[in-house]
Swiss-Prot record:
Domain of life: Eukaryota
Lipid-binding residues (covalent, S-farnesyl cysteine): 147
Record family assignment: Belongs to the HIPP family.
Protein residues bound to a metal cation: 37, 40
Organism: Arabidopsis thaliana (Mouse-ear cress)
Protein name: Heavy metal-associated isoprenylated plant protein 24
Propeptide: 148-150
One GO MF term attached to the UniProt entry: metal ion binding
HMA domain boundaries: 26-89
Subunit field text: Interacts with ZHD11/HB29.
Function: Heavy-metal-binding protein.
Length: 150
């Protein structure tokens, strides 16, 4: 095993070493219930700014929305926010222009901010519009004597 063998061994070790992937810059929006005073706002800001990778924390008291930006994992941000003993969930609203059918019942929410609707999967609209064929065939205008209720 000469110099070439040693060089190949070292190059194989360097290739096999796993490199950590850099996290993408993300924005996580949270809905935090009962942000009533400046103390609550300060507490949430302090806890979330302590999460590793956080660049900025914005709190909107009126909408009860917290926006966290940075190289972060949304699950870790959610866990840290829950440590404040407040009810926390991911921001459930999107602009109504981003939803395929914003007027279905699952998307409608009275508490939603203006021009926002609740996030719903695309399959929800299909479930509402499907009609059972047996009901449409039951009363046929082509044959009035074929009433299927009897």
């Amino acid at each position: 095993m000469g110099v070439e063998g040693t060089m190949e061994y070292i190059s194989d070790l360097l290739k096999k070493r796993k490199r950590k992937k850099k996290k993408q810059m993300q924005t996580v929006a949270l809905r935090v219930a009962r942000i009533d005073c400046e103390g609550c706002e300060r507490k949430i800001k302090h806890v979330l700014s302590g999460v590793k990778g956080v660049k900025s924390v914005d709190v909107d008291v009126k909408l009860q929305k917290v926006t966290v930006t940075g190289y972060i994992d949304p699950k870790k941000v959610l866990e840290a926010a829950k440590s404040t003993k407040k009810k926390v969930e991911l921001w459930p609203y999107v602009p109504y222009t981003m939803v395929a059918n914003p007027y279905i019942s699952q998307a409608y929410d009275k508490k939603a901010p203006p021009n926002m609707v609740r996030k719903v999967p695309d399959t929800a609209s299909v479930n509402e519009t499907t009609v059972d064929d047996s009901y449409t065939i039951m009363f046929s205008d082509e044959n009035p004597n074929s009433c299927a209720i009897m």
